[in-house]
Amino acid sequence: MAAVSGLVRRPLREVSRLLKRRFHWTAPAALQVTVRDAINQGMDEELERDEKVFLLGEEVAQYDGAYKVSRGLWKKYGDKRIIDTPISEMGFAGIAVGAAMAGLRPICEFMTFNFSMQAIDQVINSAAKTYYMSGGLQPVPIVFRGPNGASAGVAAQHSQCFAAWYGHCPGLKVVSPWNSEDAKGLIKSAIRDNNPVVVLENELMYGVPFEFPPEAQSKDFLIPIGKAKIERQGTHITVVSHSRPVGHCLEAAAVLSKEGVECEVINMRTIRPMDMETIEASVMKTNHLVTVEGGWPQFGVGAEICARIMEGPAFNFLDAPAVRVTGADVPMPYAKILEDNSIPQVKDIIFAIKKTLNI
């Protein structure tokens, strides 16, 4: 009460100054956006921007998508642009490819890329090869997107990574986002591209929130296809990855930093065309290389990176052989303990890095 009465006796201006001193402004909290919402936002902006863009796939319309990635789009754009299809990947992928040849820009969603094998003829023979076979006269501006790679408890037929499969095929562009910024920027670039683009998302990342920088909130935000990003600077070893394992690599780098090992972590973002310039420049700086992926080891993304390093100028800068961290060379088991041991974990990445550095 004494403090209050003291304030009452003071002139009003002085009281105002005293009260102001008790408060201070803090920077606003960074906007957090999930990967799911980032993809949704990117598709929404492109649907609004270009009336030739439309989305089709199983349960993408009234149900808002099996993973709710297309939430709200059917209510906003209606039946003509958000189209539910029968359970026939070969059928609706063929419709989408034909629409692209006719001048539209379809987004073809596979409920999982494991099911894209049902439509492989449409993706490879019709979409990927037509521009070449027509002598550049017939572009096929189509996006094939959906979850790729390991999920949780969905076993052998729903857990495969197709990065190497589609990255193998000329005529396709293949992107593999990790965080929300990647997801929005790459889906928008894919939709605007005049070539067929495969967008390999990850089911386990859909609900993960990431800081969303102001530039990513713009409707003009794009991430160029074919350009990697250095997520963490380092001097001792280069660690290259894509999709969900990028997060594991950053966790491993944080652990090793406490031991005096500084890892340079590269988020590939694009599988094809691969940004070898960024990878080579990093290897020339660190003199060591580890690749990390969730797919099988033989003929994988890591194998391609290692081969190109061996064939290129960075090879002479290596102080030790490059090491790959991959999924196990088996179909994905159902039991959780076996599943966990079939995909790269943080401990596996740390082990590989220490092996490469001989520590």
Swiss-Prot record:
<keyword id="KW-0479">Metal-binding</keyword>
<dbReference type="InterPro" id="IPR005475">
    <property type="entry name" value="Transketolase-like_Pyr-bd"/>
</dbReference>
<keyword id="KW-0119">Carbohydrate metabolism</keyword>
<dbReference type="GO" id="GO:0006099">
    <property type="term" value="P:tricarboxylic acid cycle"/>
</dbReference>
<keyword id="KW-0007">Acetylation</keyword>
<dbReference type="GO" id="GO:0046872">
    <property type="term" value="F:metal ion binding"/>
</dbReference>
<keyword id="KW-0560">Oxidoreductase</keyword>
<dbReference type="GO" id="GO:0045254">
    <property type="term" value="C:pyruvate dehydrogenase complex"/>
</dbReference>
<feature type="binding site">
    <location>
        <position position="191"/>
    </location>
    <ligand>
        <name>K(+)</name>
    </ligand>
</feature>
<feature type="transit peptide" description="Mitochondrion">
    <location>
        <begin position="1"/>
        <end position="30"/>
    </location>
</feature>
<dbReference type="Pfam" id="PF02779">
    <property type="entry name" value="Transket_pyr"/>
</dbReference>
<dbReference type="GO" id="GO:0006086">
    <property type="term" value="P:pyruvate decarboxylation to acetyl-CoA"/>
</dbReference>
<dbReference type="GO" id="GO:0005759">
    <property type="term" value="C:mitochondrial matrix"/>
</dbReference>
<feature type="modified residue" description="Phosphotyrosine">
    <location>
        <position position="67"/>
    </location>
</feature>
<keyword id="KW-0670">Pyruvate</keyword>
<dbReference type="InterPro" id="IPR009014">
    <property type="entry name" value="Transketo_C/PFOR_II"/>
</dbReference>
<keyword id="KW-0786">Thiamine pyrophosphate</keyword>
<feature type="modified residue" description="N6-acetyllysine">
    <location>
        <position position="354"/>
    </location>
</feature>
<dbReference type="GO" id="GO:0004739">
    <property type="term" value="F:pyruvate dehydrogenase (acetyl-transferring) activity"/>
</dbReference>
<feature type="binding site">
    <location>
        <position position="195"/>
    </location>
    <ligand>
        <name>K(+)</name>
    </ligand>
</feature>
<keyword id="KW-0809">Transit peptide</keyword>
<feature type="binding site">
    <location>
        <position position="193"/>
    </location>
    <ligand>
        <name>K(+)</name>
    </ligand>
</feature>
<protein>
    <recommendedName>
        <fullName>Pyruvate dehydrogenase E1 component subunit beta, mitochondrial</fullName>
        <ecNumber>1.2.4.1</ecNumber>
    </recommendedName>
</protein>
<keyword id="KW-0816">Tricarboxylic acid cycle</keyword>
<dbReference type="GO" id="GO:0005654">
    <property type="term" value="C:nucleoplasm"/>
</dbReference>
<dbReference type="InterPro" id="IPR027110">
    <property type="entry name" value="PDHB_mito-type"/>
</dbReference>
<keyword id="KW-0630">Potassium</keyword>
<keyword id="KW-0597">Phosphoprotein</keyword>
<dbReference type="InterPro" id="IPR033248">
    <property type="entry name" value="Transketolase_C"/>
</dbReference>
<feature type="binding site">
    <location>
        <position position="142"/>
    </location>
    <ligand>
        <name>K(+)</name>
    </ligand>
</feature>
<comment type="subunit">
    <text>Heterotetramer of two PDHA1 and two PDHB subunits. The heterotetramer interacts with DLAT, and is part of the multimeric pyruvate dehydrogenase complex that contains multiple copies of pyruvate dehydrogenase (E1), dihydrolipoamide acetyltransferase (DLAT, E2) and lipoamide dehydrogenase (DLD, E3). These subunits are bound to an inner core composed of about 48 DLAT and 12 PDHX molecules. Interacts with DLAT.</text>
</comment>
<feature type="site" description="Important for interaction with DLAT">
    <location>
        <position position="319"/>
    </location>
</feature>
<dbReference type="GO" id="GO:0006006">
    <property type="term" value="P:glucose metabolic process"/>
</dbReference>
<feature type="binding site">
    <location>
        <position position="190"/>
    </location>
    <ligand>
        <name>K(+)</name>
    </ligand>
</feature>
<dbReference type="Pfam" id="PF02780">
    <property type="entry name" value="Transketolase_C"/>
</dbReference>
<dbReference type="InterPro" id="IPR029061">
    <property type="entry name" value="THDP-binding"/>
</dbReference>
<feature type="binding site">
    <location>
        <position position="89"/>
    </location>
    <ligand>
        <name>thiamine diphosphate</name>
    </ligand>
</feature>
<dbReference type="GO" id="GO:0034604">
    <property type="term" value="F:pyruvate dehydrogenase (NAD+) activity"/>
</dbReference>
<comment type="function">
    <text>The pyruvate dehydrogenase complex catalyzes the overall conversion of pyruvate to acetyl-CoA and CO(2), and thereby links the glycolytic pathway to the tricarboxylic cycle.</text>
</comment>
<keyword id="KW-0313">Glucose metabolism</keyword>
<keyword id="KW-0496">Mitochondrion</keyword>
